Amino acid sequence: MSNVDHAEIAKFEALAHRWWDRESEFKPLHEINPLRVNWIEEHVRLAGKKVLDVGCGGGILSEAMALRGAAVTAIDMGEAPLAVARLHQLESGVEVDYRQSTVEALAAEMPGRFDVVTCLEMLEHVPDPASVIHACHTLVKPGGQVFFSTINRNPKAYLLAIIGAEYLLKLLPRGTHDFRKFIRPSELGAWCRASGLAIGDIVGLTYNPLTRHYKLGTDVDVNYMIQTWREE
């Protein structure tokens, strides 16, 4: 059975043409992207590395890592987001190898091929997150690093990530997230360890509605990122 939620794919296909509009529904992704890339580079210098971006969408993170000197392969199952990513690539001149593939299929084709794997804002949109994590472990070289981000599952996350972000502040379209698919850090950590990934750093991402700024910190109650590596 394919680890793809076709309703999730359709949701992002419908919005794909606005992916690179910094005032669109994707404004939060544009605003947090520098924080994400800088945090990744605190752990691994991207220049000269072979990097895989899983669930790349329109390529916001993919292009940013390529601009840091990485050789980036980026995969997604949405045709429209990939078309937007390739079009923007023509305009920006940033080289990224975009492919339509599941991470599981690519893992069978290219095991141990990448120095770094990123899987950000993707796990909460698939039926079987553990399968994605296992495939990421397969794709990264021994000693290589894998980065994940997702949303915690608790009442605070429901209030802020869904009621606040989607209904009150309207930072995201209604229906972007399903609370039942949110993932506690303990669950993500258990899946990583079961796949052979060692847990490193974990950092929270918070939004201040008064200043309209995002920042990284120790609060992992809602959005968080985790650094792991494949043990040699």
Curated annotation (Swiss-Prot):
Which positions does UniProt annotate for S-adenosyl-L-methionine binding? R36, G55, D76, L120
**Which CDD domains would you find in this protein's record?**
AdoMet_MTases
One GO biological process term is: methylation
Q: Which reaction does it catalyse?
A: a 3-demethylubiquinol + S-adenosyl-L-methionine = a ubiquinol + S-adenosyl-L-homocysteine + H(+); a 3-(all-trans-polyprenyl)benzene-1,2-diol + S-adenosyl-L-methionine = a 2-methoxy-6-(all-trans-polyprenyl)phenol + S-adenosyl-L-homocysteine + H(+)
What Enzyme Commission number(s) apply to this enzyme?
Answer: 2.1.1.222, 2.1.1.64
> Matching InterPro entries, A to Z?
SAM-dependent_MTases_sf, UbiG_MeTrfase
- Report keywords, A-Z: Methyltransferase, S-adenosyl-L-methionine, Transferase, Ubiquinone biosynthesis
Pathway, per Swiss-Prot/TrEMBL? Cofactor biosynthesis; ubiquinone biosynthesis
The record's annotation in Gene3D superfamilies points to: Vaccinia Virus protein VP39 (3.40.50.150)
The top EC class is transferase
Q: Does the keyword tRNA-binding apply?
A: no
Gene Ontology molecular function, alphabetical: 2-polyprenyl-6-hydroxyphenol methylase activity; 3-demethylubiquinol 3-O-methyltransferase activity; polyprenyldihydroxybenzoate methyltransferase activity
Function in brief: O-methyltransferase that catalyzes the 2 O-methylation steps in the ubiquinone biosynthetic pathway.
Its family? Belongs to the methyltransferase superfamily. UbiG/COQ3 family.
HAMAP family reported for this sequence: UbiG
Family matches, as PANTHER family: METHYLTRANSFERASE, UBIQUINONE BIOSYNTHESIS O-METHYLTRANSFERASE, MITOCHONDRIAL
Protein name from the UniProt record: Ubiquinone biosynthesis O-methyltransferase
Originating organism: Azotobacter vinelandii (strain DJ / ATCC BAA-1303)
